[in-house]
Amino acid sequence: MSVKRLIITAVAAEADAVASGLDGAQPHPQGSANVRHTATADILVAGVGSAAAAAATAAALARRHYSLVICTGIAGGIGIAGIGDIVVADAVHPADLGAMSPDGFIPLEHLGIATTANAIDPPVVEELTGPLRYAGLAPVIGGILTVNTVTGTDAHADDLRRRYPGAVAEAMEGYGVAVAATRAGVRYGELRVVSNRVGRRDRRAWDIPGALRRLEHAFAALGAAWCNDGSGQAAAREIDGGCP
């Protein structure tokens, strides 16, 4: 049975950074620009947003078995997470899935409609953070929010911090990936690199190139661990060149 991981990104630049970190990315045999193969993971460009991410993840999991699904890319930092920080989710929250009221936002749980709680299994958190710590990359652990509209005002950022005091980042795909993986019975996690602080939209303060470089470094550390734990060597036989 394969032990490969499935890595989901929103855009190609994120997938390229991940593939560079893992080393040895191979072109898809059908020539798809949306898939990159490495010895230990398949990297899929799903598109922007939770719906696109859920659909792409579900389709990929229907085609083959993966041991772990990781949603990754760049993100806005909240709370203690600063620009350039690598953040790993201990929970995924759909921060705008619910209803508005005169008293503010009401999540689905409080409406009695559904549950949106998606805590990450602690062993998955450790699987992602352990190699990062070993490489000296000091990950920040906390909740990662999934939104359909990214935050662009300080007032909304303050509201998110109030509602999710343990949150460290905001992105757009994690909840969709979590739902698809959970329904397929596959473990999942989310890892991001902060490119900007959540709040008033100021592109001059963003560092997307730096965040992508840090994303590459993060997956270089993960790839080394995956190759060295034995399971990576088994997966390596599926790809010419294998693990370094």
Curated annotation (Swiss-Prot):
User: Membrane-spanning residues where?
Assistant: none
What EC numbers are recorded for this enzyme? 3.2.2.26
Broad EC category? hydrolase
User: What InterPro entries does its record include?
Assistant: FL_hydrolase_MqnB (IPR019963), Nucleoside_phosphorylase_d (IPR000845), Nucleoside_phosphorylase_sf (IPR035994)
Among SUPFAM superfamilies, the record links this protein to: Purine and uridine phosphorylases
Source organism superkingdom: Bacteria
Gene3D superfamilies per the UniProt record, alphabetical: Nucleoside phosphorylase domain
Swiss-Prot/TrEMBL keywords = Hydrolase, Menaquinone biosynthesis
| Swiss-Prot/TrEMBL GO biological process terms | L-methionine salvage from S-adenosylmethionine; menaquinone biosynthetic process; nucleoside metabolic process
- Catalysed reaction, written as an equation: futalosine + H2O = dehypoxanthine futalosine + hypoxanthine
- Pathway entry: Quinol/quinone metabolism; menaquinone biosynthesis
From the UniProt record, which GO molecular function terms apply? adenosylhomocysteine nucleosidase activity; methylthioadenosine nucleosidase activity
- Which cellular component terms (GO) are annotated to the entry? cytosol
Chain's role: Catalyzes the hydrolysis of futalosine (FL) to dehypoxanthine futalosine (DHFL) and hypoxanthine, a step in the biosynthesis of menaquinone (MK, vitamin K2). Cannot directly use aminodeoxyfutalosine (AFL) as a substrate.
Q: Which PANTHER family match?
A: 5'-METHYLTHIOADENOSINE/S-ADENOSYLHOMOCYSTEINE NUCLEOSIDASE, FUTALOSINE HYDROLASE
Q: Give the family, as the similarity comment puts it.
A: Belongs to the PNP/UDP phosphorylase family. Futalosine hydrolase subfamily.
Name of the protein this chain belongs to? Futalosine hydrolase
Gene source species: Acidothermus cellulolyticus (strain ATCC 43068 / DSM 8971 / 11B)
